[in-house]
Swiss-Prot record:
The chain crosses the membrane at residues 9-29. One of its GO terms (biological process) is cytochrome complex assembly. This is Cytochrome c-type biogenesis protein CcmE. Signal peptide: none annotated.
Length: 151
């Protein structure tokens, strides 16, 4: 093999190895950042994995919000109108968080079936509902509650 052909072959191999490594790293990073959405029914039925970060969403049950008096710990119940799941969170809830509205919590399920959230997302206006929550509500035969009109 002449030197020019050998040099070209090495360059092509180096490029292919570099592209392969880049694709592998990108896939690894994407796999670690995927958070699958689970409804309260799926979580209650044991379909959601424990010790894996997931997204859990539904409607916050009225009267279920409990705040700790001496810390930022919050506990509330989320439902899809079939089954409910308890969510615990340590931190400041979003300003738009209210009972009776749709939320999505990101966290892990503990051995007791409670979602220990590290992030809670609330809808940003009364017309928005996360697509996953809307789908889960439709599957359960419910519709999203209509907000009370102000004034």
């Amino acid at each position: 093999m002449n030197p020019l052909r050998r040099k070209r072959l090495l360059i092509i191999l180096a490029i292919l190895v570099g592209v392969g490594v880049a694709v592998g790293l990108a896939l690894s990073a994407l796999q670690q950042n995927i958070n699958l959405f689970y409804t309260p029914t799926q979580i209650a039925n044991g379909e959601a994995p424990q010790d894996t970060r997931i997204r859990a969403g539904g409607m916050v049950e009225a009267g279920s919000l409990k705040r700790s008096g001496d810390s930022l710990d919050v506990t509330f119940v989320v439902t899809d109108f079939n089954k409910s799941v308890t969510i615990t969170y340590r931190g400041i809830l979003p300003d738009l968080f209210r009972e009776g509205q749709g939320i999505v919590a990101l966290g892990k399920i503990n051995a007791d079936g409670v979602v220990v959230a590290d992030e809670v997302l609330a809808k940003h206006d009364e017309k928005y509902m996360p697509p996953e929550v809307t789908k889960a509500l439709k599957e359960s035969g419910q519709s999203a509650p209509t907000p009370a009109k102000e004034g």
